[in-house]
Amino acid sequence: NRSEYRKTQHNRLIIDAYNANLSSMHAALHSFAQTEDAHKMMILGDMRELGAASADAHAEVLQLALTTGCQQVWLVGSEFTKALTTLSADQAALFRTFADVEAVKAELEANPLNDHLILIKGSNGTRLFQLPELL
């Protein structure tokens, strides 16, 4: 587990933005589900290089995300966006999708987050490691 805890001027971050596969996502989300905070959210990037298992793996992570107690979950990348179709409309309301990290950065610049505990988890290729400086 290469996660790093960082407290910024505005938020508390758990950063694990360099590696993501199904088992590491499970571990990170299970751990995050145990945390108590009034304003929990996650920013999850696609898991890369999963091949034929990708659709099922991303759908499984979405189901797990529903159990973490988060108020919102931002999804970055096309695999998570496709997986959203496996959820009901009520379930999908928790999630917000972004094409790439640049879209997330634009949102954070327009609408900064404050007083959140945020898990940032995704494959290195999703470039989520660029986000902490904006949080």
Where are the regions a protein language model picked out?
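ATP-dependent carboxylate-amine ligase
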Residues: 1-135
